[in-house]
A protein has these predicted regions:
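Short aromatic-glycine-(Arg/Gly/Cys) micro-motifs in beta-strand/loop hairpins
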Residues: 9-22
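A short, exposed loop/beta-hairpin motif centered on an aromatic-Gly-Thr core
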Residues: 25-35
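Structural detector for hydrophobic anchor residues on beta-strands
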Residues: 5, 17, 27-29
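Compact nucleic-acid interaction/catalytic patches
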Residues: 30, 38, 46
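Short, charged, surface-exposed hinge/linker loops at domain edges
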Residues: 1-5, 42-91
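Residue-level detection of beta-strand scaffold positions
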Residues: 19-21, 28, 45
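Residues that cap or initiate secondary-structure elements
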Residues: 13, 25, 87-89
Length: 91
């Protein structure tokens, strides 16, 4: 199932672009350009989710955009990353 997770972009004047995902504490990435950031952010998120699945952790539902805006403010830049997440089926 494709899930869309919101990343919050950070960029200081003399730094690369950084991104963090509010739904996954500790999942961060960087890129020297926005295009590089998109690639690296998707890889980081996939790796983070794979680790959670391997550890038997539940994958959170994506936050809703208005909730992220309320928490982190409108002045931030955001990036939405689509990730295929396998659903757990309990038999």
């Amino acid at each position: 199932m494709l899930k869309q997770y919101i990343g919050i972009i950070d960029k200081d004047e003399n730094s690369d672009y950084g991104i963090m995902f509010p739904d996954f504490l500790g999942c961060v990435s960087v890129g020297s350009t926005i295009e590089a950031l998109k690639i690296m952010a998707k890889k980081a998120l996939e790796f983070h989710i794979e680790g959670m699945i391997a550890d038997g952790e539940e994958i959170p539902e994506p936050s809703k955009f208005p909730d992220v805006i309320d928490k982190y403010g409108e002045k931030n830049d955001f990036l939405v990353i689509g990730i295929e997440v396998e659903e757990k089926i309990n038999l």
